[in-house]
Amino acid sequence: MVAEKETLSLNKCPAKLPTRTKLLAQQPLPVHQPHSLVSEGFTVKAMMKNSVVRGPPSAGAFKERPTKPTAFRKFYERGDFPIALEHDSKGNKIAWKVEIEKLDYHHYLPLFFDGLCEMTFPYEFFARQGIHDMLEHGGNKILPVIPQLIIPIKNALNLRNRQVICVTLKVLQHLVVSAEMVGEALVPYYRQILPILNIFKNKNVNSGDGIDYSQQKRENIGDLIQETLEAFERYGGEDAFINIKYMVPTYESCLLN
């Protein structure tokens, strides 16, 4: 009888329950979670009740590709280039051992363009500066070499490395204005050059309220691509725009508008 009275009193006054008993009463009963089955899409397992379909793998459009040994590095280490490094108050520059105008452009210019894939000093410096020097003094020697430059340009862009792409875009802008008819000679090769530009065209850096120093250094990849496409259109002749538009659908003409 005493035990029954205690039980009744506890039922009537739940506030007098021990703390541990109260906590246990407040906790919800455990619910058994069914085991989920991860499966590939469009399979029989994917149609089962507890299956979770695995998403598609990343396409890797912006993923950097591994670099390969370049012919430029091999020739440089072998001492086959008539160049040396010269220091002055403005920084490093190339000291040419021969007159640039007398160089065999069919031999040297494609090799220097092959060095656009380089990312380490001094190879990347010699390749980049050597190209600009040769384009500055090449004149009518540049146009016949254009077909030999396309594969090195394509290889450099296909690395998908931001630094390499920016350097290559600046080289392309210089190449277009380096001699007459060069811009028009590049039009048939847009299908090999422009796909990577189409991928990275909108990859601008959003710095918010901060200062974007990449714009001052001309290293903002989206802006450089826009400048390069506009240079192609200006110097590529009447067929340039339609061919650019075919490969980069979001490009708008800088001449027609």
Curated annotation (Swiss-Prot):
One of its GO terms (cellular component) is vesicle. Pfam families: ParcG. Keywords: Cell projection, Cilium, Cytoplasm, Cytoskeleton, Flagellum. Signal peptide: none annotated. Expressed in trachea multiciliated cells. It comes from the Eukaryota. InterPro entries: Parkin_co-regulated_protein. GO terms for biological process: flagellated sperm motility; protein localization; spermatid development. GO terms for molecular function: actin binding; alpha-tubulin binding; beta-tubulin binding; G protein-coupled receptor binding; Hsp70 protein binding; Hsp90 protein binding; ubiquitin protein ligase binding. It is found in: Cytoplasm, Cytoskeleton, Cilium axoneme; Cytoplasm, Cytoskeleton, Flagellum axoneme. Microtubule inner protein (MIP) part of the dynein-decorated doublet microtubules (DMTs) in cilia axoneme, which is required for motile cilia beating. Suppresses cell death induced by accumulation of unfolded Pael receptor (Pael-R, a substrate of Parkin). Facilitates the formation of inclusions consisting of Pael-R, molecular chaperones, protein degradation molecules and itself when proteasome is inhibited. May play an important role in the formation of Lewy bodies and protection of dopaminergic neurons against Parkinson disease. Microtubule inner protein component of sperm flagellar doublet microtubules. Forms a large molecular chaperone complex containing heat shock proteins 70 and 90 and chaperonin components. Interacts with STIP1, PRKN, GPR37, HSPA8, TCP1/CCT1, CCT2, CCT3, CCT4, CCT5, CCT6A, CCT7 and CCT8. Interacts with MEIG1. Linked to PRKN in a head-to-head arrangement on opposite DNA strands and share a common 5'-flanking promoter region. This is Parkin coregulated gene protein. It comes from Bos taurus (Bovine).
